[in-house]
């Protein structure tokens, strides 16, 4: 019996030891579930307090529409004089009606840059159709514009708090954060690309800021923070009277609400969209459409990569390719590179030349860097391009963010040449009011000059840009037959000279 008892004790102990990891895992899972439930409960309390501070959940649910008039200063991030310059401002005032019951928005604005003409805009956006009117000219809104408006309406604080109340399982606490000198409590709402973090004032319980992190071709992780202040009553609901938006710490817009009202009787004719516009409405695609790139031959071994609003110049130099301009986005650059691999099998892109730093012309640079392509850029923009490659990229990781080697980024000197012979391309500094640090690409054998933004070849040519290009050509002593645009088409040199001789 003692022996049997000993055997039984040993067997029982062994089984207990074998069960220990499973028991520990179960306890950890239970603790984890309890922690999640606690975080959700704490987050729900913050959201409920915010709803009460704004007038109560019932008042928020009773909002059929909100009308506000405003003035604003909007700053064009990515369109500065240099990468380090302050963003250029556009001043705007207007009125917006968010019709939540009808899922539509009416916008009426007037805006102008400091020295520019007034631009009058009116927009009506519904889930299925949109109208864009600029200085009296009406067009159908793009599908992407309708998506942006719908997302913005959902992101208004009165709608965001309601969505949080209705979806407590999607809430979780985040560590406190200091915002404008005060410690705020944060709640993460949703998951994935739609996730937002809302920060609440500990004294007023009102939402102070909403933060969203998305992927950006220039900034990598783009942290957009919308800050709300000066909350005042509007028909039983508190709404903010000042709204600031900053992107990675840089102010993008400052809006002052001069009046706000709720549940107005709407005039249906204000939202009317002519049949001629409605018939041209494009459905919202389930996924972004594929980008198509076509290679249009300019001359022997020289092509323009076309498709959409932005173009690149491609020069084959023996066993490698030079690409001038990487505009718009990662997707655009991938489409260009895929097209070149298909057309020139075994002939890699060895050098990329961006013309200038403006974001719509540099949004595709990172993809070239990630694929190991060396970059030659104006000396003013070297650090800007290196910054693109070094930007943290956790939302959409790439080869660089995973530890890949950064290719060389070098400065173009005075009339730097890439290659020799008939495919040699010269990089020329182009003085212009458009920006500092602009390059033009000149292929001497074909007498073509590739430029972006300074001049857009089309039915008419801008006199100012034509004069700037003509002055540079004369100063360099080069001969040009055609100007190839990064936008638009191709202009004969005689037309450029003629346009440059006209008054504005």
Q: Model-predicted segments: where are they?
A:
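Bacterial N-terminal signal peptides that target proteins for export
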Residues: 4-24
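Flexible, processing/modification-adjacent segments and terminal tails
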Residues: 40-52, 117-119, 124-196, 202-204, ...
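N-terminal mature ectodomain segment of secretory-pathway/periplasmic proteins
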Residues: 45-52, 56-138, 172-175, 330
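Gly/Pro-enriched, hydrophobic low-complexity segments
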Residues: 114, 180-273, 442-444, 451-452, ...
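Zn-dependent metallo-beta-lactamase
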Residues: 254-318, 416
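Conserved beta-strand hairpin/beta-sheet module of binuclear metal-dependent hydrolase folds
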Residues: 296-342, 438-456
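Active-site metal-binding motif and surrounding structural segment of the metallo-beta-lactamase
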Residues: 331-376, 476-481
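Divalent-metal (often Zn2+) His-rich catalytic cores of metallo-beta-lactamase-fold enzymes
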Residues: 470-504
């Amino acid at each position: 019996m003692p022996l049997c008892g000993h055997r039984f004790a040993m067997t029982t102990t062994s089984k207990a030891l074998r069960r220990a990891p499973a028991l520990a895992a179960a306890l950890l899972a239970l603790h984890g579930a309890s922690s999640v439930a606690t975080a959700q409960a704490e987050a729900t309390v913050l959201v409920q307090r915010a709803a009460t501070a704004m007038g109560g959940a019932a008042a928020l649910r009773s909002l059929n529409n909100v009308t506000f008039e405003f003035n604003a200063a909007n700053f064009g991030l990515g369109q500065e004089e240099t990468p380090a310059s302050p963003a250029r401002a556009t001043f705007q005032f207007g009125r917006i009606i968010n019709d939540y019951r009808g899922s539509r928005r009416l916008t009426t604005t007037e805006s102008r840059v400091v020295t520019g003409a007034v631009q009058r805009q009116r927009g009506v956006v519904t889930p299925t159709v949109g109208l864009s009117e600029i200085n009296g000219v009406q067009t159908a809104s793009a599908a992407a514009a309708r998506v942006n408006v719908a997302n913005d309406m959902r992101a208004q604080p009165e709608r965001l708090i309601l969505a949080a109340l209705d979806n407590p399982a999607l809430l979780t606490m985040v560590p406190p954060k200091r915002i404008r000198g005060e410690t705020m409590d944060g709640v993460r709402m949703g998951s994935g690309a739609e996730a937002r973090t809302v920060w609440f004032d500990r004294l007023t319980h009102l939402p102070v800021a909403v933060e969203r992190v998305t992927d950006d071709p220039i900034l990598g992780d783009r942290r957009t923070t919308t800050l709300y202040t000066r909350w005042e009553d509007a028909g039983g609901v508190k709404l903010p009277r000042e709204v600031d938006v900053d992107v990675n710490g840089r102010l993008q817009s400052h809006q002052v609400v001069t009046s706000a009202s709720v549940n107005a009787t709407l005039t249906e004719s204000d939202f009317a969209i002519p049949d001629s516009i409605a018939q041209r409405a494009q459905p919202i695609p389930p996924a972004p459409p594929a980008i198509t790139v076509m290679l249009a031959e300019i001359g022997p071994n020289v092509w323009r990569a076309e498709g959409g609003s932005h173009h690149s110049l491609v020069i084959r130099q023996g066993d490698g390719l030079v690409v001038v301009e990487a505009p718009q986005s990662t997707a655009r650059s991938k489409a260009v590179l895929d097209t070149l691999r298909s057309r020139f099998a075994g002939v890699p892109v060895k050098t990329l030349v961006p013309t200038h730093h403006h974001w719509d012309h540099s949004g595709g640079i990172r993809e070239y860097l990630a694929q190991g392509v060396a970059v030659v850029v104006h000396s003013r923009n070297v650090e800007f391009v290196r910054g693109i490659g070094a930007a943290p990229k956790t939302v959409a990781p790439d080869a660089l963010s995973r530890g890949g080697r950064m290719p060389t980024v070098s400065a173009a000197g005075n009339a730097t040449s890439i290659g020799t012979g008939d495919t040699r391309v010269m990089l020329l500094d182009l003085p212009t009011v458009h920006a500092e640090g602009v390059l033009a690409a000149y292929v001497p054998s074909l007498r073509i000059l590739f430029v972006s933004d300074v001049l857009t070849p089309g039915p008419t040519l801008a006199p100012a840009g034509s004069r700037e290009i003509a002055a540079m050509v004369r100063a360099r002593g080069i001969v040009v037959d055609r100007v190839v645009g990064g936008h638009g088409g191709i202009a004969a040199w005689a037309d450029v000279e003629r346009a440059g001789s006209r008054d504005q």
